[in-house]
From Swiss-Prot:
Residues 229-475 form the PPM-type phosphatase domain. It comes from Oryza sativa subsp. japonica (Rice). Residues 1-11, 187-211 have a biased composition (Basic and acidic residues). It comes from the Eukaryota. GO terms for biological process: signal transduction. Its cofactor is Mg(2+); Mn(2+). This is Probable protein phosphatase 2C 52. Mn(2+) 1 binds at residues 265-266.
Length: 491
């Protein structure tokens, strides 16, 4: 049983004679209990006493350790040897012992711990609560961890909660900050590449949003020497999304002017076509034999880019693909490569000449190749590989890759005065506009951009239900020395 200090003081002042008698009587009883407890405890009590005495004494003003715990309240006496269950009335002997110990404690000199400097570290112990139990003193123990704080903090900021920070945690945070301040070069390089890729992705997203919003975009370009001028037009048409992409590049390698033009028509999604736009020409110009053996470089680059795309998509469940119809101008030689059903057509001496043949499953040579590889060509609205894909060659298409390859067919054409212009277009144009009609429409327009727009508008008016994208390249034989400048996109 625990008595409040204020109540004891009031009782002592009210009856000093009875308090003196109780003190002498309690002292005699306490000495008897002490002797009995020491004899019963033996060596164990001696060791426990030694361990307890090694700890600093509890500050006498700290009354928190004697407060009754709301959930567990057992009273311990003489190191825990005598316990009283909650609700049991204390005996007269226990009351006398408690009064005697409290009187002795109040009479004993107070030893204060040296005050801790304001703002000093707060030591936190996660060990179970421990305290020094004075023999004959009955008190209740809270199982909460013991926290040692400075007296100045308790007295200077009463009732204020102190935020306790672990020095171990602070040290770990400092180590993390140090590691972040000195990044590894490889990590920096990867971070830079990630930022660059994110920037490119944002630009591509803006372009897609623009096409999806207006459904139409076009533009033009001229070479520095004035020999080439080209225009492009891309129209979403009746489709809900845009899966056609185009690419135009110009560069100088070994003092030779290099120009590259490409149409990429995606199916089952836009990922493959977009990948080709970003990587196909870049890989081609890096090929070691690009200038010396251009045909070999194109063939190997097509296969390499297809393999890299499949690797990049290995973690996904998509299986989209794309065509590729490209024209590469190196000096006075034009190389046209094709995979799929996009097409390249030139106008030479006023005649329409196809420089590529569509890769369709109903082509006798393509059907024989597919069946020799173990594939099947069947009719499903049109002739399809495995009843699924309506073209016999393509980039991507992992599930049909054994039969649907990305090996290009390449045609070489020498540039002479009879070569007037080149048309590259997706099947959204060629399905409704024959080669001869396309050539006739381009002849009417002087500017290649206007000609490209004319082709897409004609295809749409004739009922094309696909995306429509085309590039028109005109060879200006009479303007070899003329000035030129790029033109901006229009929509």
């Amino acid at each position: 049983m625990v008595y409040d200090g204020a109540v004891k003081d009031q009782e002592s002042s009210a009856n000093p004679a009875s308090a003196s008698a109780a003190l002498s009587e309690a002292s005699a009883a306490a000495s008897e209990v002490t002797a009995a407890a020491a004899a019963g405890a033996g060596a164990g009590a001696a060791e426990e006493g030694a361990a307890v005495s090694g700890r600093p004494p509890r500050p006498p003003h700290d009354k928190r350790l004697g407060v009754r715990h709301p959930l567990k309240h057992r009273r311990f006496r003489a190191g825990g040897k005598v316990m009283v269950e909650p609700g049991d009335p204390p005996s007269a002997q226990e009351v006398a012992d408690e009064e005697a110990s409290e009187v002795e404690q109040e009479a004993a000199p107070v030893e204060r711990e040296p005050p801790q400097e304001e703002g000093g570290d707060v030591e936190v112990s996660s060990a179970p609560a421990e305290m020094e139990v004075v023999e004959g003193d009955a008190m209740e123990v809270s199982p909460e961890p013991a926290v040692a704080v400075g007296e100045s903090e308790l007295e200077g900021r009463p009732g204020e909660e102190e935020e306790v920070s672990s020095p171990v945690v602070s040290q770990g945070e400092r180590k993390q900050e140090t590691a972040a301040a000195a990044p590894v070069p490889a990590v920096e390089e990867k971070k830079h590449k990630d930022q660059e890729n994110k920037h490119k992705e944002r630009e591509r997203e803006k372009e897609r949003e623009r096409v999806d919003e207006v459904g139409y975009m076009s533009g033009g370009w001229k070479s520095e020497d004035g020999f080439l001028s080209c225009g492009y037009s891309s129209f979403r048409g009746k489709r809900a999304s845009m899966e056609d992409f185009y690419d135009i590049k110009s560069s100088k390698i070994d003092d030779k002017q290099i120009s590259l033009f490409g149409i990429f028509d995606g199916h089952g999604g836009s990922r493959a076509a977009e990948y080709l736009k970003e990587h196909l020409f870049e890989n081609l110009m890096k090929h070691p034999e690009f200038m010396t053996n251009t045909k070999l470089a194109i063939s190997e680059t097509y296969k390499k880019t297809d393999s890299e795309f499949l690797d990049s998509e290995s973690h996904t469940h998509r299986d989209d693909g794309s065509t590729a119809s490209t024209a590469v101008l190196v000096g006075n030689h034009l190389y046209v490569a094709n995979v799929g059903d996009s097409r390249a057509v030139i106008s030479k001496a006023g005649k329409a000449i196809a420089l590529s043949e569509d890769h369709k499953p109903n082509r006798s040579d393509e059907r024989k190749r597919i069946e020799s590889a173990g594939g099947v060509v069947m009719w499903a609205g049109t002739w399809r590989v495995g009843g699924v894909l309506a073209m016999s060659r393509a980039f991507g298409n992992r599930l049909l890759k054994q039969f649907v390859v990305a090996d290009p067919e390449i045609q070489e054409q020498e540039i002479d005065d009879e070569l007037e212009f080149l048309i590259l277009a997706s099947d959204g144009l060629w399905d409704v506009v024959p080669n001869e009609d396309a050539v006739s429409l381009v002849k009417i327009e002087e500017e290649p951009e206007a000609a490209a727009r004319k082709l897409t508008e004609t295809a749409f008016s004739r009922g094309s239900g696909d995306n429509i994208t085309c590039i028109v390249v005109k060879f200006q034989h009479d303007k070899m020395d003329g000035d030129s400048s790029p033109t901006s996109d229009k929509s």
